[in-house]
A protein has these predicted regions:
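Bacterial N-terminal signal peptides that target proteins for export
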Residues: 1-9
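Bacterial N-terminal signal peptides
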Residues: 9-19
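Blade-edge motifs of beta-propeller repeat domains
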Residues: 22-38, 69-89, 126-149, 179-199, ...
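Beta-propeller blade termini
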Residues: 40-50, 91-101, 106, 151-161, ...
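Acidic/hydrophobic-patterned starts of short beta strands in beta-sheet-rich repeat architectures
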Residues: 50-59, 101-110, 161-170, 211-219, ...
Length: 476
């Protein structure tokens, strides 16, 4: 009888998945040192205090904007200056990039005190001078073209591939803006660049989408999406030609992702209460390959594509508001498989923004989620539970001025894949990820090389000798 039961137990061990009750994420929210309930929106990742380390920026809607830096095992707010913290202007969108070509990123805070149309307070463009944060829009010469229209997301665009970034502002109920330095003055160039359309602007991404220049995809509400092809620094909307207008849907979270691991970027696009899209370029037309359960409608906010568990396959995190979050893994041949969630499910969470970064430099990404809108909640922070033998490679491209080369494309080439990632210029929805290409390494992967396509379309290849490191590469 004892032998009989032993056989049954052995059989059950074989047939029951060992990871049946395993959590993908672990909750590390406790490392946030001061984490009260608040109304938060967009999240970005940049080096706020120019100390060489990346920090999370969390916007506040009637609450302080935060700069969370990892110090002594804790995430601590390191900025309490009025121009940055700015609790009265109701910030929702944020992105960082180097507009003045000094090698450090300025921070664009998009403020919105009304749902649509004309707003009371303009946006801020924050620059660190010495130890003081200043708003470049408060300088008299820069006040000609202030944005006084309600908006949502912002994205950084190096339209000429010369390291001179501009900021695309997705406005709601008013024309799109595109801010850039011209003769040492910040001006709106949206009209001359063919970008000044009026729509319900929501999410926006920029990168090597359909050309070797930096193109723009904008997911809109109550109107068609835009797909701007960059031709000699000006833009032509080709959304209809490429079949991504999606006029019956209301766009939200958007990210660039190499869905087929073929060495090019495609588009993940979530729609509010509508079908989510996985647009893959085939024969000069984007085909939506999304299937259930990935495409099932939800109250989507942020979409993030990243390798959380360092297995060499990207996950897709869907941050929903007022309903549970979802997680998927992109397998070979465009198969998108759902991963059960318990930790980070947040079925009662009012998620409004999210971003990823390896904030503690241990080779595993952290996921920071902000909450708010109709219900004040604290921030939450998660990271994947991973096997100790998993390896990673992180690639940090810097442009010729020494700033993050946002919009550049990094491709890992090996015996198993050709896997592209964008150096994030702004994505998700209201948000922006760390400007590093983070790769987990697959089992039996070898002969690894890295290719960088800079924002000017030129490419360079590099051999990789050692893993478990961050490689910093400066543009020549």
């Amino acid at each position: 009888m004892t032998k009989y039961f032993k056989k049954i137990i052995f059989f059950l061990i074989l047939i029951i998945p060992t990871n049946l009750n395993a959590s993908f994420f672990k909750d590390v929210t406790s490392i946030i040192s001061d984490n009260p309930k608040r109304l938060s929106y967009g999240v970005s990742v940049t080096d706020v205090n120019q100390d060489g380390n990346f920090d999370f920026i969390v916007t506040g809607f009637g609450y302080l904007n935060l700069a969370l830096s990892y110090e002594n095992g804790k995430l601590i707010n390191i900025v309490n200056q009025e121009k940055f913290s700015d609790e009265f202007r109701r910030t929702i969108g944020v992105a960082a990039c180097d507009l003045d070509r000094d090698g450090y990123e300025e921070i664009y805070f998009l403020n919105t005190d009304t749902y649509s149309g004309t707003k009371k307070y303009s946006d801020r463009l924050i620059d660190l001078k010495g130890e003081k944060f200043i708003d470049l829009f408060e300088i008299k010469k820069n006040q000609k073209d202030l944005n006084l229209t309600a908006g949502r997301s912002v994205v950084c665009v190096d339209r000429n591939g010369d390291g001179k970034y501009g900021v695309y502002v997705a406005n709601y109920g008013g024309p799109t803006r595109f801010y850039e330095y011209s003769d040492d003055v910040i001006v709106d160039k949206s009209v001359q660049l063919n970008l000044a359309k009026i729509t319900g602007g929501r999410a926006v991404v920029a990168g090597h989408i359909i050309s070797n220049n930096i193109d723009i995809f904008a997911a809109n509400e109550r109107g068609p999406n835009f797909l701007y092809k960059n031709k000699d620094g000006k833009f032509l909307d080709v959304a209809n030609e490429y079949r991504v207008e999606d006029v019956l849907q209301n766009g939200r979270g958007t990210a660039l992702s190499d869905i087929y691991y073929r060495g090019r970027l495609d588009i993940l696009n979530g729609n509010w209460g509508g079908f989510h899209r996985a647009y893959v370029l085939k024969n000069k037309i984007f085909e939506d390959i999304a299937k259930p359960p990935f495409d099932e409608p939800s109250r989507i906010r942020t979409i993030i594509s990243a390798d959380f568990d360092n297995d060499g396959f990207d996950e897709i995190f869907m941050n929903n508001i007022g309903e549970q979050n979802k997680l998927f893994k992109i397998l070979e041949n465009g198969v998108i498989e759902q991963i059960p969630l318990d930790i980070a499910l947040e079925k009662n969470g009012y998620g409004t923004g999210a971003a990823v970064a390896d904030i503690d430099n241990d080779g595993v990404l952290e996921l920071l989620i902000s909450h708010g809108e109709s219900f004040d909640q604290p921030l939450s922070l998660y990271k994947a539970k991973i096997a100790s033998n998993r390896k990673y490679l992180r690639v940090k491209p810097l442009n010729k001025y020494g700033a993050p080369a946002r919009g550049a494309t990094v491709t890992l080439i090996s015996n198993l894949r050709k896997h592209s990632k964008t150096i994030d210029a702004g994505s998700g929805y209201l948000c922006q990820m760390e400007p590093i290409a983070h790769y987990g390494i697959r089992e039996k992967e070898k002969n690894i090389k890295i290719q960088i396509k800079w924002t000017n379309g030129k490419t360079e290849k590099y051999s990789v000798r050692d893993l478990n490191q961050t490689i910093t590469i400066k543009q020549k």
